[in-house]
Amino acid sequence: PDQIAILRNHSRLLKTRAKDFLMLGRMLHPLKLDEPTLAIAAPLDKHSKGKGEVPTPAILTSSWQSSDGRIGHLFVNISETKQPLNVRLDTRNTPARGTYDVELYESKDRSSFQPLWQGVPLPKEFARELAPMEVVFLELREAR
């Protein structure tokens, strides 16, 4: 994977309020994705000079809770091709609260967070095609 592109996309993300989750928040159990895997070359062990292939999901994910209780889900397409993302969003292992407003950050747009849904109950299906090296972050907060 193009590591510079991935780092650049993460750096942009950390300039948004996603830092409340990724730097100051608490990691939650990640969402389960049913996505293709890649074979990534990696050292077999610390003493070996040989490399083996490690099966790795094409889309990496992590889930977070900010100090004020918002939930965030991060998705990163580490492949060099477009990948479909199909996921059932929930609040992970935190207590569910009525309905949620959901905002979306996409690195390919270099934008700030944009409203996605308002006042939706969870769990809810989310589907999107991720461009190569794209970073997507979803923020879930209790509906106002």
Question: Language model features by range: what are they?
Answer:
Residues W117-R144:
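C-terminal beta-strand-rich structural cap/linker in extracellular carbohydrate-active enzymes
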Residues V102-P123:
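Solvent-exposed beta-strand/loop surfaces of large extracellular or lumenal domains
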Residues R88-R92, E103-Y105, A131, R141:
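A structural detector for beta-sheet-dominated domains
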